[in-house]
């Protein structure tokens, strides 16, 4: 359901944009653009080993998700995201998936750290069969240890 935090199998290389898919050598990419080396490295790690991501469900199957002017809209209505810090704005991250209808049997996910999150804005919707679990307790940081709402 919307607002739940889930874990899911991280997308493979094929999920990422065509511009990133052209990369063959992360070292050469480092020499070309040092600012993106860590995101490019993560991209290769995803292809090599199975990892899990943890994100919040934002859009459900059949819903129209749009990101505009720092806000998320579901079917034209602004999404109230009380779980975010008031200063957090949501931008497109120049991702291709910021105005879409969520396909059947998929969800649109986003991280709460919106400015740094690799999520559905970047790699698209997650098939329901890729969901591994629902998060219900937080261990870290210790000052936030407890049940996740």
Task: Identify what each model region corresponds to.
Residues 1-149:
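Extended hydrophobic leader/signal-anchor segments used for secretion and membrane insertion
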């Amino acid at each position: 359901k919307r607002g739940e935090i889930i874990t899911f199998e991280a997308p493979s290389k094929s999920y990422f944009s065509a511009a990133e898919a052209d990369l063959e050598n992360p070292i050469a990419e480092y020499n070309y653009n040092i600012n993106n080396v860590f995101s490019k490295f993560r991209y290769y790690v995803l292809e090599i080993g199975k990892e899990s991501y943890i994100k919040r469900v934002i859009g459900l199957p059949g819903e129209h998700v749009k990101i505009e002017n720092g806000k998320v809209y579901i079917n034209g209505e602004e999404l109230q995201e009380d779980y975010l810090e008031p200063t957090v704005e949501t931008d497109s991250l120049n991702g291709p998936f910021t105005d879409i209808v969520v396909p059947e049997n998929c969800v649109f996910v986003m991280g709460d750290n919106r400015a740094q999150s690799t999520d559905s804005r970047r790699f698209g919707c997650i098939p329901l069969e890729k969901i591994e679990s629902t998060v219900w307790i937080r261990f870290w940081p210790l000052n936030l240890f407890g049940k996740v709402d």
